[in-house]
């Protein structure tokens, strides 16, 4: 709705196809959650999803012209209803009072486009509710376990699991394995000998944020606000100032700031990166390093950016920000996937979420980061189609029960889009006037 990376400008025209594709996939997530709410699996939707307006922010004439063209394109599309646009300082100050404080509107013009259809999602709470439901249905959940190896053994996969507390190991055999191990997914797929990931590499990037719980500030910023990347800057460099709701408590987060650690998981090993380097993926690493100097420069700058430097970045959004109100928090660890490419590039950065499976459909995994969790149900539908295609006809009724628009194009079917939107808004408790700009 507001991320400008998904609506690039090409030869003076705004391409909204990626934004439409991601929006369509996110609607499947909303349908899946709504189905689970109606069936008692998710018992408290407002614990994980809350209405929060989404805003796109432009600074300077070039960005304003881009944002105006983007707004015109999205406002005419049924998948982005009730989009609004303003470039006067009075509306800006009314909608974003915190960001207007200390701002010299005469020195640099600004503009915003916004929609009240946005949400804030706490995926930790969502995951917790799914696990609670699994336990209620008799599922035993074992924590402190790490999959250390996956090997083919006849018609089965032999999965080695280690108890991280005792060191004891257990072997589980399965006909199908799904690898949803975050930053460790690529390593496990490589250990399994999946040829589809030959030459793949991963580069870890940590995320840091400035956070404030000062309610005097929080109450003046009831939105997620995304800006535009500087010319030549990588997509992950785009900062945003967000209202977040966690366990019912509102906070503001600004970032992300890129950090660097060789770990592939937040609690991983400092040897993760070095152990992942193999003969087949060295060209991928070298190719990306040589052809993505902007990314290398960005990471170096971010690693050496101190607290005052982080606050200086915040000043672009909130000019009157005082560092005393903010603290640095370390978020998760993401592994940027590097895909092998032909000469002369050798390696390319993959910025989306990729589903990888072997040709027999017996093992699959998810690689990549953004948009990540928000489109997981759509990724799992794709997995079913790839790996269990012979069962899809038998499973059709159940899939349509869980995803009423499964098989339909929400990009083309406005009536279907509107119907599912009304249903999910009501079921998820989002049909409210609270938190609107």
Regions found by a protein language model. Give the residues of each.
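C-terminal catalytic lobe of FAD-dependent flavoproteins
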Residues: 104-117, 125, 260, 264-394
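Helix-loop-beta segment of a Rossmann-like dinucleotide-binding subdomain
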Residues: 44-56, 94-137, 158, 294-298, ...
